[in-house]
Regions:
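Extracellular leucine-rich repeat
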Residues: 2-192, 207-210, 229-241, 262-265
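Entry beta-strands of beta-propeller and related beta-repeat scaffolds
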Residues: 212-218, 267-273, 316-322, 363-369, ...
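Beta-propeller domains
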Residues: 194-196, 214-246, 278-288, 332
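Blade-level signature of beta-propeller repeat domains, shared across WD40, Kelch, NHL, RCC1
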Residues: 464-468, 484, 488-526
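Repeated scaffold domains used in trafficking and secretory/extracellular systems
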Residues: 201-208, 253-262, 303-312, 352-359, ...
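Beta-strand-rich domains and repeat architectures in extracellular enzymes and scaffolds
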Residues: 47-51, 196-228, 257-261
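Structural motif
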Residues: 225-231, 279-285, 329-336, 375-381, ...
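A short beta-strand motif characteristic of beta-propeller blades
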Residues: 192-199, 241-252, 294-301, 343-349, ...
Length: 526
């Protein structure tokens, strides 16, 4: 396994003598030499050709192409000369070597591709060269990115000696000898969100949940007036709806306009809270025997005026439900599970037209963040003696925040703050307050959703007036970098769902089809 050898500095004419036979190198060939070539019995040297010369005999053992005008070697370029033992390209415009370019050259021992324009070599270009003794690629402007990783791997496993020259980019390896690169120098695994399935309806929210060992998803359909529950269909390999709330046999209230449905499993029972702008908000219970949902209770009929968002959580063993109320005279209300239903526990933040509520823990303390259209986001913390949330602080310099989503990274708590126009922000909790980390431009944004998929961390900023932006966290800089665009019309929610070792991202669209993307892994060196 060498990257240099006894032939590395050997003069080319010596190799030609060894391959062609020194005593017979001037003997006239028995075949007609192409007009652009000079030929002996076993050798051909061709100058300024526009391609691999045709008409060469199959028993030629040495071929040299100098100052050629063609730019690529295609598959099977030398099938007519299977006896070649030495092949040379030099001082030409050759820039691309495709897969299987040298197929059929079972006897080739010396391959010189020097001082050309080659920036990369296809992964299977050298396939079939089992007898190769020496490879020389010096003098080429190699771009040492993932497309060249295979060559570094090949060098570590071959017995052939090699001279490869130096990298001409990218920046971090510019000027490095290609022979000094190692596999760990390449980061060639990336990811993408690929469209997997479209659902023919508009949606506002997407809520994944676990029930009986399977993951499901609840989707709010405002124009259809219902909440649909979807599961993975193992036979069709796609998601399908298996139940609906506010659908036949239950009549749809006129103008009900559901805005959120929140599934939760309480005491082993599946409940779904359906918040509506009209017709009342209700709690529904799944009945296994009948395979449908039945209405359990109306939720706070005297308290909820214009619900906009829901959050469910557990504190000190109790289940709570928070309903953000966006009416001018309303108040965000906290309900507690009492065994047979949810009952009002605390009123928060009256008269501020709250648009979103997020539950999180700050330094181990249960907390709520309320986003409002009339003031900065407010942080509440749980008081155990009073069994209530008390105002703790607000988030500075962030008026008109529509929604708040949080995530944890390396022990720190971050929030994604959504603004419709201007800049949405990522902020980090630093003991007593949130501080800026990063700004992202919003173009009609109503959702800024952090997503954790495997070891990858993303943040998706939905835009009504441009493409939605997927950002991926870069551990080296500690920032999110723009990664991909999604063409989802008027997105209102993004959610991650894992099914049988496959990861999906649901994108709820308010004006078009709701879309499901599959998270895929791509090897850029393949």
């Amino acid at each position: 396994m060498g990257r240099g050898g006894p032939w590395a500095c050997a003069p080319l004419f010596v190799l030609l003598l060894l391959v062609g036979g020194g005593g017979e190198r001037h003997r006239a060939p028995r075949w007609k030499c192409p007009i652009v070539c000079s030929c002996t019995q076993d050798n051909a040297l061709c100058d300024r050709t526009d391609g691999v010369p045709r008409g060469l005999p199959p028993d030629i053992t040495s071929l040299s192409l100098v100052r050629s005008g063609f730019t690529e070697l295609r598959e099977g370029s030398f099938l007519q000369t299977p006896s070649l033992q030495l092949l040379l390209f030099t001082s030409s415009t050759l820039g691309l070597i495709r897969d299987d370019a040298f197929v059929g050259l079972l006897h080739l021992e010396y391959l010189f591709i020097e001082n050309n324009k080659v920036g990369s070599v296809s992964k299977n270009a050298l396939r079939g060269l089992k007898g190769l003794v020496h490879l020389d690629l010096r003098g080429n402007p190699f771009h040492c990115d993932c497309r060249i990783k295979w060559l570094v791997e090949w060098l570590s496993s071959t017995n052939a000696s090699a001279e490869l020259g130096e990298c001409q980019g990218p920046g971090e390896v510019n000027g490095t000898q290609l022979s000094q690169l190692h596999l760990q120098d390449f980061d060639c695994i990336t990811t993408a969100l690929a469209l997997f399935q479209s659902l023919p309806f508009q949606a506002l929210s997407v809520e994944p949940f676990w029930y009986q060992g399977e993951q499901h998803v609840a989707i709010t359909q405002p124009f259809a007036g219902r909440c649909s529950l979807l599961e993975w269909d193992h036979l069709d390999g796609a998601f399908r709806a298996y139940a609906s709330i506010n659908a036949p046999p239950h009549p749809v209230p006129t103008g009900s306009s559901p805005v959120a449905c929140k599934p939760l499993v309480v005491e082993g029972r599946l409940l779904v809270v359906l918040a509506q702008l009209a017709g009342g908000s209700h709690v529904w219970r799944w009945e296994e025997a009948s395979g449908r949902f039945v209405r359990l209770q109306e939720l706070g009929p005297q308290r909820i005026r214009k619900p906009n968002a829901l959050a469910s959580f557990r504190v000190d063993g109790d289940w709570f439900l928070a309903v953000a109320d966006s009416s001018k005279a309303g108040a965000t209300t906290l309900f507690r599970w009492g065994g047979r239903g949810f009952y009002a526990h605390q009123a928060l933040h009256a008269w501020h037209r709250d648009t979103h509520v997020e539950f999180l823990e700050l330094a181990g303390q249960p907390s709520l963040i309320l986003a409002s259209s009339s003031q900065r986001p407010v942080v509440y913390q749980w008081s155990r003696p009073g069994r209530a949330f008390l105002r703790h602080t607000d988030i500075p310099d962030m008026d008109d925040v529509y929604a708040v989503k949080h995530f944890r990274l390396r022990g720190d708590v971050y929030v994604c703050l959504t603004r419709f126009i201007g800049d949405s922000k990522v902020m980090r909790w630093e003991g007593s307050m949130f501080r800026d980390v990063q700004h992202m431009p919003s173009r009609g944004s109503m959702v800024f959703q952090p997503l954790g998929i495997g070891s990858h961390r993303y943040a998706v900023l939905g835009n009504d007036y441009s493409f939605s932006q997927v950002y991926r966290y870069d551990a080296r800089s500690g920032l999110f970098v723009r990664f991909q665009e999604l063409n989802t019309q008027a997105p209102r929610s993004f959610a991650h769902l894992a099914v049988h070792q496959r990861d999906f991202v649901f994108a709820a669209s308010f004006k078009g089809d709701t879309q499901i993307y599959r998270h895929i892994t791509i090897d850029l060196s393949a």
